[in-house]
Design a protein with these regions (language model features):
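Post-HExxH zinc-binding segment in Zn-dependent metallohydrolases
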Residues: 202-213
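Contiguous, non-catalytic segments that form substrate-binding/exosite surfaces or channel walls
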Residues: 1-161, 170
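Acidic/His metal-coordination segments adjacent to aromatic residues that form catalytic metal sites
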Residues: 160-170, 192-202
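Active-site recognition of the HExxH zinc-binding catalytic motif
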Residues: 176-190, 211
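Alpha-helical scaffolds flanking conserved acidic
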Residues: 172-176, 205-207
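Extended hydrophobic-aromatic, low-complexity segments
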Residues: 187-188, 196-197, 207
Length: 213
């Protein structure tokens, strides 16, 4: 399967095949199934360096704030490894075209793959994001009584106004919060981080908090 990942990483066309081993939960059967879908990349979100450069700038600022200590050399290796990893990321922002279980809507948000760190060391990672899909789904949702009781009608109305009337700003928020989260998975990790942390089973739990931060 590592060889499948290596071949898959070399597909860099606007039409992308979903990662063949990325699992999603099936809420109906309480099971998992192989993902195998086709995705179309939005030409408006072509590959560019502005996201990576901003992330590098912020990452460098945080790193430079560290006080020198006995682990400085180790931190520098992780810092350099993270920069090299960022340079190998392929970003695809688009929409699903064909996918298994088409009636099970809600699968698509964003993802970074593959999870094989040996392959990622060689080939990098792909980030998939589905901003148009999320926007359309969000706009289709009705007001819920529970939401109104918790947040109040005024906040829900402002949120709905933003959702429908400020499309460009909505995409910017998605870019920072969701695409930025996926890039965040790449920072502060080297080739051994996952295997070392998984000795106690803590990697995925801590990793999600780290990526969001």
């Amino acid at each position: 399967w590592a060889d499948v990942d290596r071949a898959w990483m070399k597909i860099k066309t606007p039409i992308q095949i979903g990662h063949p081993l990325e699992y999603y939960e099936d809420h109906f059967r309480k099971a998992v199934a192989l993902e195998w879908d086709i995705r179309l990349t939005n030409p408006k979100f072509a590959q560019n360096d502005h996201r990576v450069n901003k992330i590098k700038s912020a990452f460098a600022k945080i790193y430079s704030s560290f006080e020198p200590n006995t682990k400085s050399e180790e931190y520098k290796k992780i810092y350099d490894f993270s920069f090299k990893s960022l340079d190998k990321v392929q970003l695809y922002v688009g929409r699903p075209a064909l996918f298994f279980g088409a009636e099970f809507n809600g699968m698509f948000s964003a993802q970074v793959v593959p999870n094989d760190e040996i392959v990622s060391l060689e080939e990098g990672k792909k980030i998939f994001a589905f901003s148009d899909e999320i926007l359309q789904t969000s706009r289709a949702k009705p007001f819920l009584k529970l939401s109104r009781e918790i947040f109040g009608q005024e906040l829900l109305t402002k949120d709905r106004m933003f959702l429908f009337n400020e499309t460009a700003s909505w995409h910017q928020v998605y870019d920072i919060s969701t695409v930025g989260h996926e890039y965040g998975h790449i920072l502060w990790c080297d080739e051994q981080t996952e295997s070392v942390m998984n000795k106690t089973g803590n990697f995925k739990n801590i990793e999600e908090f780290k990526a969001t931060t």
